[in-house]
Amino acid sequence: MSGTLRTVRRPWAIAALVVAVVSLGACSSDDDGGAAALTWYINPDNGGQKTLAAECSEASDGAYRITTQILPNEADSQREQLVRRLAAGDTSVDLMSLDPPFVAEFANAGYLMPVTDEQDVAALTEGVLDGPMETATWDGELVATPFWANTQLLWYRKSVAQAAGVDPTAEDFTWDRMIDAAESQEKRIGVQGRRYEGYMVWINALVASGGGEIIRDTEAGVDAIPSMASPAGDAAADVVGGLARSPAAPGDMATAGEEEARSLFQSDSGSFMVNWPYVYGAASSAVDDGSLDASVFEDIGWARYPRIDAGRASAPPLGGINLAVGAFSEHQDEALDAVKCITSVENNAQYMVEAGNPAARSAAYDDPAVREAFPMADLIRESIDEAAPRPITPYYGDVSTSVQRTWHPSTSVRAPSTPERTDTYMSEVLHGERLL
């Protein structure tokens, strides 16, 4: 990730951006018989958001018409494009699909419309799971609505676990036991070790599972306190560095993302993997198209994210997408109504089945179609509800990049030196003493 909003508040930059987007106002004109023309900036998916846009437009009975604009694939590139538009006061940004870690940054800059009406707040938050709800507020106000949420599960090959004599579904199953089990069977563990946001997701989950925080007192802005140098940070470093230097580490750990981990897990070397629920549907589709043997799919089991300490429940990763209304939209009332439609329980369930992205509202997991598509629906719901968000700070980009740079490559990670180095590095970045 490239810095924070501090880099886009310079008058010369904003002036240039205004010129670049001055012609976009027409995108929000009412040109459909009085219907408000809304533009929804979406992250790439399989077309599910475009479908919801059409269905909610139809259901509005002429009140609004939603057009979607696709953002880049990478989260940091999505952020960059939205920042450029919003810094220029672009009125075409009526709705945006926003990665949860960026909500605080955007809200702090005044780019998101706060929801203040009590009835609106109730409609947008009723039944939303606790994990994603933590990411939707800033400074005591609701500034975004969880659209879909995500979490990582522990995926395991039943045959490997049985041969190693371990039960990954046991409440006290830890990273150490998992590494030992994989080593005993000469197998490899799939993780996300590339220097990117997925690596930050893993590290944050480990620190949170140990009862710690990467940074605390985030409401203090640049004066927040980096707190990796702690028992929880040391325990996280022991897991990351210990796995990286063990025989259970994949050969491509330093460059592995979600797909590399999935490929390893489905191979003869696979044993355990932490990854998002999409991997289950991907494996099923691979069987259907003949690229994966059915016996491999039948060998896949799932459990809650592994523990750091046998006596402390894990804090699974939290991902997903929040919806926010642009602060400069000329159709904020209609945009808010559209958010209510898009994030309804019914549409949460539909999107989970069709796009494979888990719902943010608890009731969606009781939908028969969801339960058929996701046999582990209850576990996903529990994991999202008890997940730990990444640091909620307007300077998230600086925080995440500081962690990624000081913890990579994973073979170099050791306690207590790595967490201590991270705290120093992060503090220098936040106070402008070091450039990213």
PLM features: residue spans?
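Conserved N-terminal structural module of periplasmic/extracytoplasmic solute-binding proteins
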Residues: 2-104, 121, 428-436
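A structural signal for short loop-to-beta-strand junctions that line the ligand-binding cleft
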Residues: 83-85, 92-94, 124-160, 311-315, ...
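Hinge/lid segment of periplasmic solute-binding proteins
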Residues: 100-151, 209, 297, 301-303, ...
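Short, solvent-exposed loop/beta-turn-alpha elements that line the ligand-binding surface or hinge
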Residues: 117-128, 171, 193, 212-235, ...
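Extracytoplasmic/periplasmic solute-binding protein
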Residues: 143-147, 152, 176-229
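Conserved C-terminal helix/tail region of periplasmic/extracytoplasmic solute-binding proteins
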Residues: 162, 382-436
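Glycine-centered hinge/linker elements that transmit conformational signals in sensory
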Residues: 180-183, 221-254, 301, 305
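C-terminal lobe and pocket-closing loops
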Residues: 278-296, 308-406
